From Swiss-Prot:
Keywords: Ribonucleoprotein, Ribosome biogenesis, rRNA processing. It comes from Methanocaldococcus jannaschii (strain ATCC 43067 / DSM 2661 / JAL-1 / JCM 10045 / NBRC 100440) (Methanococcus jannaschii). This is Ribosome biogenesis protein Nop10. GO terms for molecular function: snoRNA binding. Belongs to the NOP10 family. InterPro entries: H/ACA_rnp_Nop10, H/ACA_rnp_Nop10_sf, Nop10_arc-typ. Involved in ribosome biogenesis; more specifically in 18S rRNA pseudouridylation and in cleavage of pre-rRNA. GO terms for biological process: pseudouridine synthesis; rRNA processing. GO terms for cellular component: ribonucleoprotein complex.
């Protein structure tokens, strides 16, 4: 039975279901998901931007 998992070419970044990349011929790999963390590293900056935009809109 054929495994139907998305694969990614490490050379050109193309996603496919094939073992070999149809674009460049490189062997594809199953990409790992990004690390998950409950700690929001960029939340502080998002909140600062949100406040700055809110204050800018009030000034107009």
């Amino acid at each position: 039975m054929v495994e139907m998992r998305m694969k990614k070419c490490p050379k050109c970044g193309l996603y496919t279901l094939k073992e070999i990349c149809p674009k460049c011929g490189e062997k594809t790999v199953i990409p790992k998901p990004p690390k998950f963390s409950l700690e929001d590293r960029w939340g502080k900056y998002r909140r600062m931007l949100k406040r700055a935009l809110k204050n800018k809109n009030k000034a107009e």
